[in-house]
Amino acid sequence: MHQIFPSTFFNFEFLRLLGTAPYLGAETGECLATAARIKDGDPESWYQAWYEQAQKALALADEAKAVGDGPGAAWGYIRASNYFRASEFLLHCTPEDPRILSSAVASADAFDKGWILLDGSVRKVEIPYEGGNTLPGRLYLPAPHHQVSGKIPVVVQTGGFDSTQEELYYYGAAGALPRGYAVFSFDGPGQGLSLRKDKLYLRPDWEHVTSKVLDHVIGELAPVHNLDVDRLAVFGASLGGYLSLRAAADPRVKAVVSCDGPLDLFDITRSRMPPWFINGWLSGWLSDGFFNWVIDRLASVNFQLAWEFGHSKWVYGVKTPADVMRTMQKFSLKDGYLSKIKCPTLITGAADSFYFTPQQNAHPIFDSLSALGPAEKHLWIGKDVEGGGLQAKIGALALMHHKMFAWLDETFGIRRDEL
């Protein structure tokens, strides 16, 4: 695979953005010009370059809007939204940085400006949560000429470890709407504006989050918008794959797509550490203080490690690397939870992910779906960048959409005429 940046981490995040170009999230020339202004491993240059490009796209959108060019304005606003999102992404080692929230708000605002000019419709929704808080959501509805017969099948899409609701559009609604599916996406605790504005932290028992989301989608939105609650799927990618499987134990979920999700977060992180170090800490032979000191020293010379632990501390609401490791132990599907899933399930893996392997995750997840027969569960392992081999199918979103919706069509009995 061609490297735009020498480091795997920066290259992956660049491809993550460039891969949205088919769905209005980026322009190839703009991305290449922006990459030329970024110093590999330098989050400040990353922020400045993408923020400047977001402002340029915003100006183009305003210019198009002023002359009545709806498509030009929509595309410009949506690109600006994605560039704003990318700009703050690598600042998460210092979550108190005010640029994180301001860029996230700018991303959401630009996205909404663009979407009202596109085919189809979207409704902004607030989901009642806990402690008087709400979770921001969007219901995307297909245009009438894309709708299938009968009620509208719906996909409830959850984010993951580091996504925002605006980014979720490229993975879900962009493929769903032309195929006649509605999509409901949301920022849960630890995600998007729920984290940045409301300081709600990620939780392992995601079924408690999606239970409230399903209450609202089924009880409030479905009757008004003709949604088919008997053809309701849940979808998530990367950590969202884990979260979607937590949601799938709810009997109201009729199908689930878990894209490249982990089986056990702690096991993945543990496998990347020297055995003497992690086992010494687990046994108590090495103290929290020593563990934290070692991680902090390594992070001072390895930006990817610094970002991973910095972002983890933020989304989990903890203070130290040792606290991160203890929290990760709660994010596991190894306790028999998968046996609770009774709905048809599509599991995917990424053979070329630099985070974790299908052998660690996709295969044991698939094998642990003990309540499902062979016809009720399906496994797809993507290989190479063009074949869905990168984490969350980065760079192969069209293929992911094809695989996912072909499987959902079959599962939900949706028949389409040959073209």
Curated annotation (Swiss-Prot):
Active site, UniProt feature: S238
Keyword Hydrolase included in the entry's annotation: yes
InterPro entries xref list: AB_hydrolase_fold, FrsA-like, FrsA_esterase
Keyword Hydrolase: yes
GO MF, any single term: hydrolase activity
Pathway assigned in UniProt: Mycotoxin biosynthesis
Family the entry assigns: Belongs to the AB hydrolase superfamily. FUS2 hydrolase family.
Role: Hydrolase; part of the gene cluster that mediates the biosynthesis of the mycotoxin lucilactaene and the lucilactaene-related compound NG-391 that act as cell cycle inhibitors with potent growth inhibitory activity against malarial parasites, moderate growth inhibitory activity against cancer cells, and no activity against bacteria and fungi.
Protein name, as recorded: Hydrolase LUC6
Organism: Fusarium sp
Protein encoded by which gene: LUC6
